[in-house]
Amino acid sequence: MKKNVHPKYNEISAYCSCGNIINTKSTLNRNLNIDVCHLCHPFYTGTQRILDTRGRVNIFNKRFNLSINADFLPIDKKLNKK
């Protein structure tokens, strides 16, 4: 068998934008910056919020003239039948 074929397994830190620091191991040689973690992700916290780091949601809403609190009416299936 060949020797030294596996990469080194280093201890790194993952820094979340909420301030949480996660210590883990990886083959990377650098620390990570992440947007969400288990403490701030909407699935785990049970809250709904929009994570928009580049203004993409505002651009989309502006382009299609949508507001965040718009009431969407269900499409009547009877009108689509011929």
UniProtKB/Swiss-Prot annotation:
Q: Which residues bind Zn(2+)?
A: 16, 18, 37, 40
Q: Which GO terms describe its molecular function?
A: metal ion binding; rRNA binding; structural constituent of ribosome
GO-annotated cellular components? ribonucleoprotein complex; ribosome
Query: Its Gene Ontology biological processes?
Result: translation
Q: Which UniProt keywords apply?
A: Metal-binding, Ribonucleoprotein, Ribosomal protein, RNA-binding, rRNA-binding, Zinc
Q: Which SUPFAM superfamilies match?
A: L28p-like
Q: List the disulfide bonds.
A: none
* Cofactor(s) needed: Zn(2+)
Family note: Belongs to the bacterial ribosomal protein bL31 family. Type A subfamily.
Q: What is said about its interaction partners and assembly?
A: Part of the 50S ribosomal subunit.
Q: Which NCBIfam families match?
A: L31 (TIGR00105), PRK00019.1 (NF000612)
Functional summary from the UniProt entry: Binds the 23S rRNA.
What's the protein called, per UniProt? Answer: Large ribosomal subunit protein bL31
**What organism does the UniProt record list as the source?**
Blochmanniella pennsylvanica (strain BPEN)
The gene for this chain is rpmE
